[in-house]
Amino acid sequence: MLDESSIPVVREDIQYRELNDGGVVYDTSAERIHTLNLTAAYIWNCCDGSRNVMQIASELHEHANVPIDKALNDVREAITYFEKEGLLHS
């Protein structure tokens, strides 16, 4: 399980484009595209090294007006995916 104190940071060589309904991530080294929904795009934009998992969940909770446990679950799920796909610094 993802530690709530972990501080996710997006790799510098990853390109991101915001869309009306989320965003698109392009991994230049793997030449892969990842489509993000609005929630995942919000979380992606928070992975700048200035917040830990719990802080991102708290911001999502307030921004999207969802219960904190749902926000934390969404953050864990998204960051786990980002890690699995190699989009974050290890």
What annotation goes with each model-predicted range?
Residues 1-41, 45:
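Acidic, low-complexity/disordered tracts enriched in E/D and polar residues
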Residues 29-90:
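Long, charge-rich, low-complexity alpha-helical segments
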